[in-house]
Regions:
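Hydrophobic alpha-helical connector segments
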Residues: 68, 82-110, 165-168, 192
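Short secondary-structure transition hinges
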Residues: 110-141
Length: 226
C-alpha cells in the first residue's frame, strides 16, 4: 500500500520488537521537537535502546525509516483512494470534496511531527521529494479522473482537469502543512471549510443547486496559542 511499494521484504523475519522500538523512538524524538536533520542514526538507536548495527539491520538509513512511518500514517488516505474508505471513488465529486479534504487535514493533524519532518526532508533530499511527488500524483490522478467524469455529465466547468487537480491537491497539502507547522491562527475545521468552498467553486462554479450537501463555511476560528 506504500507509495514506493513494499521495501525490505527480507526484513520480515527480523526482530519485530526492535523494529518497532526504532520507529517509536523516531516518533518520540520528533514529537519532542527534534528536526529531521538532527535525527542521527546514533541518536535514534540510543533512544530505542539498540546499537547502530541493529539499526542498519532494519533500515538502510534514516530516510527509509521516515518513509516507512509515512506509509503507516497515510494508510487511511491510500485505502480511501483505493475504494476501501468512506469517501472513496469520487474525490472531487460535489458531495465528496469536504470529506476528502477533512480526511487529509485529520491525518496531518494526527501525525503533525511526522509531516513536519517529511516536508523538511523534501527540501533537501531528492528521494523524499520524489516520494512526496508520487504521493501527490496518486491524488491528482484520482481528482483529474473525477473532474473529467463530472465534465462529461455536464456538471463541471470546462477547465483543464490535470491543471485543476494539481492545483487543488497541492493547495490542500500546503494548507494542511501550514496548520501543523506552527500554532494556527485558524481552526482546522475553518480551513477545511474554506478549502472546500475554493475547490467546489473551481470545479463546479456557482451552482448552488448541485451542491446543497456541501456545508457553508462557518465563521469560527481560534486565537493563536500563546
Amino acid at each position: 500500500m506504500g507509495v514506493l511499494g513494499k521495501r525490505g521484504g527480507a526484513r520480515s523475519a527480523r526482530n519485530n520488537d526492535q523494529h518497532r522500538q526504532l520507529l517509536d523512538a523516531t516518533l518520540a524524538l520528533l514529537a519532542e521537537g527534534a528536526a529531521y536533520a538532527e535525527l542521527t542514526v546514533q541518536l535514534i538507536a540510543e533512544r530505542a535502546g539498540v546499537s547502530r548495527p541493529t539499526f542498519y539491520a532494519h533500515f538502510d538509513d534514516r530516510r527509509e525509516l521516515l518513509l516507512e512511518l509515512m506509509d503507516s500514517a497515510l494508510a487511511p488516505a491510500v485505502a480511501d483512494l483505493a475504494g476501501q474508505g468512506p469517501t472513496s471513488g469520487t474525490a472531487l465529486g460535489p458531495t465528496r470534496i469536504r470529506p476528502t479534504i477533512a480526511l487529509a487535514m485529520s491525518i496531518f493533524r494526527d501525525h503533525a511531527p511526522l509531516f513536519r519532518a517529511l516536508i523538511e526532508a523534501s527540501t533537501y533530499d531528492d528521494t523524499v521529494r520524489d516520494w512526496l511527488g508520487s504521493l501527490a500524483a496518486q491524488f491528482i490522478d484520482a481528482a483529474a479522473t473525477t473532474i473529467r467524469a463530472q465534465q462529461a455529465a455536464g456538471n463541471a466547468l470546462p477547465l483543464d482537469p490535470k491543471a485543476a487537480a494539481t492545483t487543488l491537491v497541492w493547495m490542500t497539502i500546503d494548507a494542511a502543512y501550514r496548520q501543523v507547522r506552527n500554532p494556527p491562527d485558524l481552526s482546522d475545521e475553518l480551513v477545511v471549510d474554506t478549502l472546500t468552498t475554493v475547490a467546489i467553486r473551481t470545479v463546479y462554479g456557482d451552482q448552488p443547486n448541485q451542491h446543497a450537501s456541501a456545508p457553508a463555511p462557518p465563521n469560527r476560528g481560534r486565537p493563536r496559542r500563546r
